[in-house]
């Protein structure tokens, strides 16, 4: 199974890379913004999102990076986990990070009479 050639006669290989000069891959509804003399082309093709800078009108080829096998932590959580000594506490074990709060006095509820 071959892919149709792009506008410059090159063949698009969607499994490994794609060419933005091809009408099949070119973003239709978005205009290119000019940033410092380079055309910034937003690309959203088969799950790949990015801003591609091209100094000329030559075809742009994008090689998508493979996704890591492990799920990344949320920003900030990696620092929190990195500062912990050792592994997480076993189930049922409590490691308080702050001293316990003092007991709270029993205050009457608003609207109730004693």
From Swiss-Prot:
Region (Interaction with host HPX), start-end ranges: 28-68
UniProt GO cellular component terms: host cell endoplasmic reticulum membrane; host cell plasma membrane; host cytoskeleton; membrane; virion component
Lineage, top ranks: Viruses, Riboviria, Orthornavirae, Kitrinoviricota, Alsuviricetes
GO biological process: symbiont-mediated suppression of host innate immune response
Residues covered by region (Disordered): 91-114
Spans traversing the lipid bilayer: none
Entry keyword set: Host cell membrane, Host cytoplasm, Host cytoskeleton, Host endoplasmic reticulum, Host membrane, Host-virus interaction, Inhibition of host innate immune response by virus, Lipoprotein, Membrane, Phosphoprotein, Viral immunoevasion, Virion
Main location (coarse class): host cell
PTM: Palmitoylated in the N-terminus.
Membrane topology recorded in Swiss-Prot or TrEMBL: Lipid-anchor
Function of the protein: Small multifunctional phosphoprotein involved in virion morphogenesis, egress and counteracting host innate immunity. Plays critical roles in the final steps of viral release by interacting with host TSG101, a member of the vacuolar protein-sorting pathway and using other cellular host proteins involved in vesicle formation pathway. Also acts as a viroporin and forms ion conductive pores allowing viral particle release. Impairs the generation of type I interferon by down-regulating host TLR3 and TLR7 as well as their downstream signaling pathways.
Region (Interaction with host SRC, HCK, FYN, PIK3R3 and GRB2): 95-104
Region (Homodimerization, and interaction with host AMBP/bikunin): 72-114
Subunit-structure text: Forms homooligomers. Interacts with host SRC, HCK, FYN, PIK3R3 and GRB2 (via SH3 domain); binding does not activate the kinases. Interacts with host AMBP/bikunin and AMBP/alpha-1-microglobulin peptides. Interacts with host HPX/hemopexin. Interacts (when phosphorylated) with capsid protein ORF2. Interacts with host TSG101; this interaction plays a role in viral release from the host cell. Interacts with host SIRPA; this interaction down-regulates the phosphorylation of host IRF3.
Protein's recorded name: Protein ORF3
